Amino acid sequence: MGFLVAVMNFSPTLVHHHMKSKPQCQNEKLRQGQTSSLFDRRGFLKCVVGASSFMATIEFSGLQAQASEEKLDEGEGVVGAFKTLFDPNERTKSGKELPKAYLKSAREVVKTMRESLKENPKDNAKFRRSADAAKESIRDYLSNWRGQKTVAGEESYVELENVIRALAKFYSKAGPSAPLPDEVKTEILDDLNKAEEFL
């Protein structure tokens, strides 16, 4: 199905270009007896590269079409897509309307922090990956939303600020690679749960 959609979405100029390149391939074959082997190889390469780029374009378009079909199957639909496009806000669990970008960023902080806190610090590779993901989501959140008046008074914002402050306070005293004690983990998880209630 994706291939048919890809062909329907295929650019007419690319088809024209491909049709235009076919005679070049045939002309190269006709001139085969008159040219040296270097030019024969060049002509052959033109044909192969032209055909392969044509097929790659069709395949890529097919994959894009398949991905868009999967998104439609996931329940977004055309109406949902238009609503998402033109409505910058989203209703939270508590019924408030907040910017979608804020909610996405805050939810990512909650998710990555929770995963990081649940990882076993003795499994260094997994622990580092989850900690790095949490740091990155916090950086993104702070760079976009710290001090923003549209969200600064929200409960979720206050709870996430508490989480970030608790982490900063602990690591400034204990050092950047110190393991979090259970009481700090519990406090942070409680704040994350409270923040999630308002997202």
From Swiss-Prot:
Its main location: plastid. Pfam families: PSII_Pbs27. Keywords: Chloroplast, Plastid, Thylakoid, Transit peptide. InterPro entries: PSII_Psb27, PSII_Psb27_sf. The keyword Chloroplast applies. One of its GO terms (biological process) is photosystem II assembly. Disruption phenotype: A high chlorophyll fluorescence mutant. Impaired PSII function, maximum photochemical efficiency of PSII was decreased, about 25% PSII in thylakoids; severely reduced growth, decreased chlorophyll content. Inefficient processing of the D1 precursor to the mature form. One of its GO terms (cellular component) is chloroplast thylakoid lumen. It is found in: Plastid, Chloroplast thylakoid lumen. It comes from the Eukaryota. Required, but not essential, for D1 (psbA) precursor processing and thus correct photosystem II assembly (PSII). Interacts with the C-terminus of both the precursor and mature form of D1. PANTHER family: PHOTOSYSTEM II D1 PRECURSOR PROCESSING PROTEIN PSB27-H2, CHLOROPLASTIC, PHOTOSYSTEM II REPAIR PROTEIN PSB27-H1, CHLOROPLASTIC. Belongs to the Psb27 family. This is Photosystem II D1 precursor processing protein PSB27-H2, chloroplastic. It comes from Arabidopsis thaliana (Mouse-ear cress). The gene is PSB27-2.
